[in-house]
């Protein structure tokens, strides 16, 4: 069929409804709509393909990420194992660096400790030398002082002994007691056995350690005057005048010790008795008899509680005079 025949309208049949009219514009619109529909279906198909591709790509990326993470873990684990092996072998760089730093600190502390030890040792040695010198100096000073004190003490004792010896030589003749001449008769058969005479021997001259040098020299001068020949004196001279008992050097007192008591100047004195002690220089001391010995007594001053030793010879010669006093 030709195009004209296709385009020409068919003859209308009798009794049939009229055929619709054909317009070319409508065909074009229909074709355009079909094209648009086909284009839309094509786009939808492309979008579905793209979505499927994106899903596959996401799955592939996730697998790659997991694989990469596992690989990183394995690499890090291998690195740590390698570092641990190097640390055990001592070849790890970080370990060597820190060990070097610790070694430097150790050497520095050792050096400081040695310097401190040296400094302290020098200080101790200096103190030792100083203390040793001070001890030696103190020892020498004490030795010299002790020697001087002993020499002075011995010289003093020597001087006192010489003075006492001189005093005994000068007063020896006056202190000697002449023995009583007695005749021993033959005892008759009926006579009783004679009882021996229990007379107490006179006290010998005692060394005096309580007098000063001035008192000793004064006693020596007095004794020398007594031993020198006396010249006749006129009644008006001072020597002819009667001397008082305290001033007369030739006056002697009766003094003895019996049964732990002192008999002096017709009075008895015992231990712990309060007395006055008068010396030749008119010094009067308040004392208490501390003890009574065989040939001497000890008295204690009430002022300073110092003790003095008084011999019987001194009391007999009048160098010291004892007076009673009230105990209150």
From Swiss-Prot:
One of the record's GO molecular function terms: enzyme binding
Annotated localization: Nucleus
Region of interest called Mediates interaction with USP17L2, as start-end residue ranges on this chain: 2-170
Tree of life domain: Eukaryota
Sorted UniProt keywords: Acetylation, Apoptosis, Chromatin regulator, Coiled coil, Isopeptide bond, Nucleus, Phosphoprotein, Repressor, Transcription, Transcription regulation, Ubl conjugation
Coiled coil: 66-171
Residues recorded with modification Phosphoserine: 32, 45, 53, 228, 234, 237
Comp. bias intervals (Low complexity): 1-16
Posttranslational mods: Polyubiquitinated. 'Lys-63'-polyubiquitinated SUDS3 positively regulates histone deacetylation. Regulated through deubiquitination by USP17L2/USP17 that cleaves 'Lys-63'-linked ubiquitin chains.
Biased composition (Acidic residues): 23-37, 45-54
SMART domains, per the entry: Sds3
Function: Regulatory protein which represses transcription and augments histone deacetylase activity of HDAC1. May have a potential role in tumor suppressor pathways through regulation of apoptosis. May function in the assembly and/or enzymatic activity of the mSin3A corepressor complex or in mediating interactions between the complex and other regulatory complexes.
Quaternary assembly: Homodimer. Component of the SIN3 histone deacetylase (HDAC) corepressor complex. Interacts with SIN3A. Interaction with SIN3B enhances the interaction between SIN3B and HDAC1 to form a complex. Interacts with HCFC1. Component of a mSin3A corepressor complex that contains SIN3A, SAP130, SUDS3/SAP45, ARID4B/SAP180, HDAC1 and HDAC2. Interacts with USP17L2; the interaction is direct. Interacts with FOXK2.
Domain remarks in the Swiss-Prot or TrEMBL record: The C-terminus is involved in transcriptional repression by HDAC-independent mechanisms.
Protein name according to UniProt: Sin3 histone deacetylase corepressor complex component SDS3
């Amino acid at each position: 069929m030709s195009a004209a025949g296709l385009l020409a309208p068919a003859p209308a049949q009798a009794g049939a409804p009229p055929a619709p009219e054909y317009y070319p514009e409508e065909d074009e619109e229909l074709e355009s709509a079909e094209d648009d529909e086909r284009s839309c279906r094509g786009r939808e198909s492309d979008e579905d393909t793209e979505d499927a591709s994106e899903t596959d790509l996401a799955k592939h990326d996730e697998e790659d990420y997991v694989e990469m993470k596992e690989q990183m873990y394995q690499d890090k684990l291998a690195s740590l194992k390698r570092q641990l092996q190097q640390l055990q072998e001592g070849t790890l760089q970080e370990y060597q660096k820190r060990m070097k730093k610790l070694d430097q600190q150790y050497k520095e502390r050792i050096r400081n400790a040695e310097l401190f030890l040296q400094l302290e040792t020098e200080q101790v040695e200096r103190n030792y030398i100083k203390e040793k010198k001070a001890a030696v100096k103190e020892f020498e000073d004490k030795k010299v002082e002790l020697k001087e004190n002993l020499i002075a003490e011995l010289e003093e004792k020597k001087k006192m002994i010489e003075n006492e010896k001189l005093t005994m030589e000068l007063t020896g003749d006056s202190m000697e007691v002449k023995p009583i001449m007695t005749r021993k008769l033959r005892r008759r058969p009926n006579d009783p056995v004679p009882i021996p005479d229990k007379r107490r021997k006179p006290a010998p001259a005692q060394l005096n350690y309580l007098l000063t040098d001035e008192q000793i020299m004064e006693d020596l001068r007095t004794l020398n005057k007594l031993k020198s020949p006396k010249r006749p004196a006129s009644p008006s001279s001072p020597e002819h005048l009667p001397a008082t008992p305290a001033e007369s050097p030739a006056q002697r007192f009766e003094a003895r010790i019996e049964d732990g008591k002192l008999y002096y100047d017709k009075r008895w004195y015992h231990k712990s008795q309060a007395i006055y002690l008068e010396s030749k220089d008119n010094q009067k001391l308040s004392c208490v008899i501390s003890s009574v010995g065989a040939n001497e007594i000890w008295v204690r001053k009430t002022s300073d509680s110092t003790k003095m030793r008084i011999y019987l010879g001194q009391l007999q010669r009048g160098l010291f005079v004892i007076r009673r006093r009230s105990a209150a």
